Structure formats: C-alpha cells, structure tokens
C-alpha cells in the first residue's frame, strides 16, 4: 500500500517521510512591502522546502496584488508556488478589498493551471501580529510550504 498522504501540516518531522528526495521545483514569490515580516515568511518557507528535498527559487514582486500575475507566469516552469505577503489594516477598508482580490486571484490561477499555490499572505491589524505569524512556532510561510509540497505529492 502507498504512503499515508493525510498527515497533519503541524507535524514537521513527517514531511521528509512523505516526500523523500524529490525533484519538486517551487517558486517562492514574496511581496516587498513590510519587509521584516515578509523576510520571516520567506525564511520559513524556503527552509521547509529545502528540508523536504525540494528546490526553492525566490522571486520578489512589488506588493501582494502582483503575487497573482507572478504565480501565473512562474507556474509555467515550476511545479508549484508559495505566495507570501502582508496586507495591513489601515484607516479605511482598502485592505479588505486588496485581500479579496489577491486570494480570489490566486485561487483562480491555481484552478486554471491545476497547480498548487501555498498561500502565506497575512491579513493583519498590527505589525506585531505579523511578526508573531512569521516566526517561532507559527510561521505562515512554513505552513504554506508544507501544504504545497503535500499537494504536489498528492497529484504525482
């Protein structure tokens, strides 16, 4: 019987046993806004990808909206992508519209190309929330990378 493909995203020790040595190529696409937070997401995602035996290549885009087009173009030559960014609440509801646009766009790309995209786009109220979710025990970049690796493996 095949390997168990329903492992929890919260079990880092299991990723190597599920994936092993692979040739998975993953584009890590990160927005440039809120660099300190995004850097934590990048570090977590790339560390997770490399530790699985997969290949990570980093691409930077101006902001979270640009993640959508970058995912679409890069998925022509990559097996999967991890999209990383930060959308910080301001004094208006602009962040809500941007978040919807980005998440809807990424989902549309994923479904159209039938390739997985791990979403590590944080929608936060404060910078501290972003720092908390991009480091330590809960790093959204790590979780996005784990999810995308498992999805690639599921469909191989």
From Swiss-Prot:
Binding-site residues for (2S)-2-hydroxy-3-oxobutyl phosphate, renumbered to this chain: 91-92, 133
Record bears the keyword Transferase: yes
Domain of life according to the entry: Bacteria
EC numbers, comma separated: 2.5.1.78
SUPFAM superfamilies (alphabetical): Lumazine synthase
Catalytic activity entry: (2S)-2-hydroxy-3-oxobutyl phosphate + 5-amino-6-(D-ribitylamino)uracil = 6,7-dimethyl-8-(1-D-ribityl)lumazine + phosphate + 2 H2O + H(+)
EC category: transferase
GO BP, one annotated term: riboflavin biosynthetic process
Listed GO MF terms: 6,7-dimethyl-8-ribityllumazine synthase activity
Chain positions recorded as 5-amino-6-(D-ribitylamino)uracil binding sites: 33, 64-66, 86-88, 119
Similarity comment: Belongs to the DMRL synthase family.
Listed PANTHER family: 6,7-DIMETHYL-8-RIBITYLLUMAZINE SYNTHASE (PTHR21058:SF0), 6,7-DIMETHYL-8-RIBITYLLUMAZINE SYNTHASE DMRL SYNTHASE LUMAZINE SYNTHASE (PTHR21058)
Protein name per the record: 6,7-dimethyl-8-ribityllumazine synthase
Species of provenance: Tropheryma whipplei (strain Twist)
Gene: ribH
